[in-house]
């Protein structure tokens, strides 16, 4: 007897949808988001494995684990690129964005579904080329910044650097195509009441991120193309002997590189706003309009401060003064966001779900990273601390603890919506405790190393630094163990099939309200636009849905 197929199991034209068609040629936002999630988790685990190799080497003075200083720098380079382009960005922007943006704007899918599919399949090809550069010739040991002259002949004479540059081109193209899709979706698809200042904060964070990507990715592409031409076509864009200037590449790279920091952290801001609002039981975050303009201000200022990475290259006093002041000004909108989150928690019966643990941990750790950033924004201070472990500690507090805690917070909050099962709550809280202890033990001692003068990118060091390096390596082992524990938690949730009884979401949460009667939801939640009602005071929005569960 023929099996009756549900509509979700049918293709777009009524035929049975095969496994290959669903996952290789998918134009469904949820399937593509799931693919990004799988890819990002794999990239994150591989990048974390490389970081453990780095810390095993630095646990004791001398070449105790990695016998070659060149290979040490190859591992550092691959770790950075893997975590940025193939772990945090695929999960925070692409996976969560693909899953949630259509739900939050009231749309059926992304505005360009086929472009969405193209955006994903460029990413595995870029990942393959990155792995190929890691194993080709001697690998790329120039750091993720690939500064010339280290990235050109004769210092990188093999093909590995060329392969890496092509990988970055593909990764950048993937991000650019996805950003155009997100920006177009967020501009054109929201129902009327969800546009402008009334947009969901996560939607706004993805919109600002998409604009930053559209501005900065072409500049990176131009810079690395110039390196490719210097290496292969005898140009001298960055060679002083031919009239070039290596500092030009630093300007091009950091015009991309600093917005990239906000590209990584802004989606985490959106996740925190959603989770804190949910766990506080409130219909809107405190100071909603201030939060909107703070996020826009952070994105705008982020494009104007790139040269604070270059205080030691010989900038004149006026230029250093401008970039130092502009960098400090970013602390103002960032402070607005942090205190608005705290005010949202105030006066509420805060539900300490696992996601709430990650959100409160994020607030503490991101604040610490921001305070060390204020010190580094001073041009005179940065001259002493530039390229020391103080800088490593600063950006890992913002990224390894900010963006990554945003990833875990989002997974704990939205996994029931994505796959219909829940993590074990007690075990998830234990995972947070282990991760929180591990990352702090790893990176807080590195402030002391930097203040003592320990430089970055060296595999060996004086014995005086051995104690804090040992403590940092111990914390790294704890962090890696907590990641393995998370793999177990994910497996346990999928095997036990611990279903969702009810979402706990308020009526104003479109990500939950659209699928409130079934988890996970169908491939397309809305067959028609939802009806949206705003209260007279414009402080929050309540959503009323017609029954529209069909395709």
Curated annotation (Swiss-Prot):
Residues engaged in binding O2: 262
Pathway listed: Energy metabolism; oxidative phosphorylation
Binding site for heme a3: 394
UniProt keyword annotations, A-Z: Calcium, Copper, Electron transport, Heme, Iron, Magnesium, Membrane, Metal-binding, Mitochondrion, Mitochondrion inner membrane, Respiratory chain, Translocase, Transmembrane, Transmembrane helix, Transport
Membrane topology term: Multi-pass membrane protein
TM segment ranges: 34-54, 81-101, 126-146, 163-183, 209-229, 252-272, 285-305, 326-346, 356-376, 391-411, 432-452, 475-495
Subcellular location as annotated: Mitochondrion inner membrane
Binding sites annotated in the UniProt record for Ca(2+): 62
Role according to the record: Component of the cytochrome c oxidase, the last enzyme in the mitochondrial electron transport chain which drives oxidative phosphorylation. The respiratory chain contains 3 multisubunit complexes succinate dehydrogenase (complex II, CII), ubiquinol-cytochrome c oxidoreductase (cytochrome b-c1 complex, complex III, CIII) and cytochrome c oxidase (complex IV, CIV), that cooperate to transfer electrons derived from NADH and succinate to molecular oxygen, creating an electrochemical gradient over the inner membrane that drives transmembrane transport and the ATP synthase.
Protein name stated in the entry: Cytochrome c oxidase subunit 1
Lineage per the UniProt record: Eukaryota, Metazoa, Spiralia, Lophotrochozoa, Mollusca
């Amino acid at each position: 007897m023929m099996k009756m197929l549900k509509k979700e199991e049918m293709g777009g034209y009524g035929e049975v949808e095969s496994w290959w068609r669903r996952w290789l040629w998918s134009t469904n936002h949820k399937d593509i988001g799931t693919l990004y999630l799988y890819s990002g988790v794999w990239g994150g685990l591989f990048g974390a494995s490389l970081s453990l190799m780095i810390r095993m080497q630095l646990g004791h003075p001398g070449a105790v684990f990695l016998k070659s200083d060149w290979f040490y720098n190859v591992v550092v380079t691959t770790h950075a690129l893997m975590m940025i382009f193939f772990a945090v960005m695929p999960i925070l922007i692409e996976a969560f964005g693909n899953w949630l943006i259509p739900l939050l704007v009231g749309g059926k899918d992304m505005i360009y579904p086929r472009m969405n599919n193209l955006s994903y399949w460029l990413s595995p090809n870029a990942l393959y080329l990155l792995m190929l550069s890691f194993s080709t010739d001697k690998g790329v040991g120039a750091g993720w910044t690939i500064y010339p002259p280290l990235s050109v002949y004769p210092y990188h004479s093999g093909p590995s650097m060329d392969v890496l540059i092509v990988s970055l081109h593909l990764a950048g193209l993937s991000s650019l195509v996805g950003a155009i899709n997100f920006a177009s979706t967020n501009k054109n698809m929201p129902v009327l009441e969800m546009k402008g200042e009334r947009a969901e904060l996560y939607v706004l964070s993805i919109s600002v991120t998409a604009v930053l990507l559209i501005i900065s990715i072409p500049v990176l592409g131009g810079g690395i193309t110039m390196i490719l031409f210097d290496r292969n076509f005898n140009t001298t864009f960055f060679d002083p002997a031919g009239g070039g200037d290596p500092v030009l590449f630093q300007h091009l790279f950091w015009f991309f590189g600093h917005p990239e920091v906000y590209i990584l952290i802004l989606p985490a801001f959106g996740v925190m706003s959603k989770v804190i609002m949910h766990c506080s039981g409130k219909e809107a975050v405190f100071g909603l309009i201030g939060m909107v303009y703070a996020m826009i201000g952070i994105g705008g200022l982020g494009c104007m401060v790139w040269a604070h990475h270059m205080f030691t290259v010989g900038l004149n006093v006026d230029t250093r003064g401008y970039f130092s002041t502009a960098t400090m000004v970013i602390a103002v909108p960032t402070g607005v966001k942090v205190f608005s989150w705290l005010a949202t928690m105030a006066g509420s019966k805060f539900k300490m779900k696992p996601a709430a643990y990650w959100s409160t941990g994020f607030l503490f750790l991101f604040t610490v990273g921001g305070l060390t950033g204020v010190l580094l924004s001073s041009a005179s201070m940065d001259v002493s601390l530039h390229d020391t472990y103080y800088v490593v500690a600063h950006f890992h507090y913002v990224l390894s603890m900010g963006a990554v805690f945003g990833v875990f917070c989002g997974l704990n909050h939205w996994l029931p919506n994505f796959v219909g099962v829940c993590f074990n709550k007690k075990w998830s809280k234990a995972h947070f405790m282990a991760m929180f202890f591990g990352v702090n033990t790893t990176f807080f001692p590195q402030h002391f190393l930097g203040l003592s003068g320990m430089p970055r990118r060296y595999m060996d060091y004086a014995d005086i630094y051995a104690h804090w390096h040992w403590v940092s390596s111990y914390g790294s082992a704890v962090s890696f163990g907590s990641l393995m524990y998370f793999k177990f938690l994910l497996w346990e949730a999928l095997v036990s099939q611990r279903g969702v009884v009810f979402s706990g979401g308020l009526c104003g949460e479109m990500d939950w309200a659209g699928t409130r009667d079934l988890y996970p939801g169908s491939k397309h939640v809305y067959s028609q636009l939802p009806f949206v009602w705003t209260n007279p005071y414009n402080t929050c929005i309540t959503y009323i849905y017609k029954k529209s569960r069909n395709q």
